[in-house]
C-alpha cells in the first residue's frame, strides 16, 4: 500500500512485479483523523488523497 503521490514507490514496486489491485479513494482523510501530521501535499506538489494497493504476481 502506498499513497497516490509516491511515484518513487510505485516505480519501485512495479519494477519488481507488483501490480495495482485497488485504489482506495480519499482513504488518507480517514488516516489523517488518527494521524493529523500526514501532510496535505506530497511529492512533486501532488495532493495526498488516495491509497494504492499493490500485489505481487507469482
What is each residue range found by the language model?
Residues 1-9, 19, 25-33:
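Conserved beta-strand-loop-alpha-helix junction that forms the acyl-donor binding cleft
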Residues 53-57:
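Short, well-ordered beta-strand micro-motif
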Residues 22-52:
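Conserved acyl-donor/pantetheine-binding loop and adjacent beta-alpha core of acyl/acetyltransferases
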Residues 12:
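Long, contiguous binding/interaction regions
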Amino acid at each position: 500500500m502506498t499513497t497516490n503521490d509516491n511515484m518513487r514507490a510505485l516505480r519501485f514496486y512495479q519494477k519488481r512485479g507488483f501490480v495495482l489491485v485497488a485504489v482506495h479513494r480519499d482513504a488518507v482523510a480517514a488516516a489523517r483523523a488518527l494521524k493529523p501530521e500526514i501532510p496535505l501535499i506530497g511529492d512533486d506538489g501532488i495532493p495526498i488523497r488516495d491509497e494504492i494497493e499493490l500485489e505481487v504476481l507469482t
